[in-house]
Amino acid sequence: MFLHNTKFCRLASGLAGGVRNLSGQKPKTAILMLNMGGPTHTDQVHDYLLRIMTDRDMIQLPVQSRLGPWIAQRRTPEVQKKYKEIGGGSPILKWTELQGQLMCEQLDRISPETAPHKHYVGFRYVNPLTENTLAEIEKDKPERVVLFSQYPQYSCATSGSSFNSIFTHYRSNNLPSDIKWSIIDRWGTHPLLIKTFAQRIRDELAKFVETKRNDVVILFTAHSLPLKAVNRGDAYPSEIGASVHMVMQELGQTNPYSLAWQSKVGPLPWLAPATDDAIKGYVKQGLKNFILVPIAFVNEHIETLHELDIEYCDELAKEVGVEEIRRAATPNDHPLFIDALTNVVADHLKSQQAVNPKFLMRCPMCSNPKCRESKSWYRQLCSN
């Protein structure tokens, strides 16, 4: 399903070790790529889960300081087993490093006035942790830092948590006064991102026999969200829907399609239908050929490599009688996607807008006091 990428294999070992600016020049523009991350090795799984389960931006639990660590401890063996089944760890760091390196190479060519550019990786729950990367950036003393969310569609639980962690870090650490800061918080409808997803889908459609091709269900799947968060006004579901709509426009509405939600945790109501339930439901209706499209993920990780590939495309498909099911690759290092990253940043650097006004808004029913403080802090930070 996935092509062997020699460029990725050649660069991966060096990039994963933290070699991010191959020229060694002092960067003028630092680009901090924010994401949740994933454990590179199974011995990192417990701490990764512990950070997730104690992050109230990501998940809210009763007596979280006690229940969160208990859940992390209990789930560690099960999650370690899943990582072993996909090769022993998450490739998200290697992909992010490669994406950042290729993006900065292009930025140096097309935007010499803001060069040299250097990418940095800031993960929320596993090394390289965002707060440690911020210290690395400060040592490099760039003129400008762009905080670039690697979640194309914004959610308070994902993008919001990453941005709140930066606010929390500088609440107890001195903020460098000689750096200009700006934010890219959402970019889920960027034309080149849309073209990337469309091409990934075309690649998989071409593998179906021609007589079935137009009947293949394109099933977009995104990480689910608790309805409690949706009802507060989180923009995530509408932004996912916008991405789906534009991808289908790019494809020319050639196939039946739908949107489902994966990776629910716990008993409370979340967005529905669940991806596995959607597959079961369509099979009952006589639709038995599918392409799964992870519309919210820009690189491979456990939720694509295990949940989609193993649990759904392999195990579930056999169980319910699917005829043929394929999974579109995430953008990874597709040339269109590297162009998308480059264009998003280049356009941002040329603009006079340091922060999207939407980012400075809170959800209409926001109940998180940290968000109020964080938004106020970012408003001031980006006005300097």
Curated annotation (Swiss-Prot):
Keyword Metal-binding carried by entry: yes
GO BP term, pick one: heme biosynthetic process
EC primary class: lyase
An example molecular function term from Gene Ontology annotations: ferrochelatase activity
Domain of life: Eukaryota
One Gene Ontology cellular component annotation held by this UniProt entry: mitochondrion
Pathway of action: Porphyrin-containing compound metabolism; protoheme biosynthesis; protoheme from protoporphyrin-IX: step 1/1
PROSITE patterns referenced in this protein's UniProt entry, alphabetically: FERROCHELATASE
Membrane topology of the entry: Peripheral membrane protein
Subcellular location per the Swiss-Prot or TrEMBL entry: Mitochondrion inner membrane
Enzyme Commission number: 4.98.1.1
UniProt-listed Pfam families: Ferrochelatase
Cofactor annotation remark: Binds 1 [2Fe-2S] cluster.
Annotated [2Fe-2S] cluster binding sites: 156, 363, 366, 371
Active site: 190, 343
Reaction catalysed by this enzyme: heme b + 2 H(+) = protoporphyrin IX + Fe(2+)
Cleavable signal peptide: none
Cofactor(s) required, per the database record: [2Fe-2S] cluster
Record's keyword terms, sorted: 2Fe-2S, Heme biosynthesis, Iron, Iron-sulfur, Lyase, Membrane, Metal-binding, Mitochondrion, Mitochondrion inner membrane, Porphyrin biosynthesis, Transit peptide
NCBIfam families in alphabetical order: hemH (TIGR00109)
Function field: Catalyzes the ferrous insertion into protoporphyrin IX. Terminal enzyme in heme biosynthesis. Contains four conserved cysteines that function as cluster ligands and play a crucial role in maintaining protein structure.
Subunit structure and binding partners: Homodimer. Homotetramer.
Name the record gives this protein: Ferrochelatase, mitochondrial
Organism: Drosophila melanogaster (Fruit fly)
Classification lineage: Eukaryota, Metazoa, Ecdysozoa, Arthropoda, Hexapoda
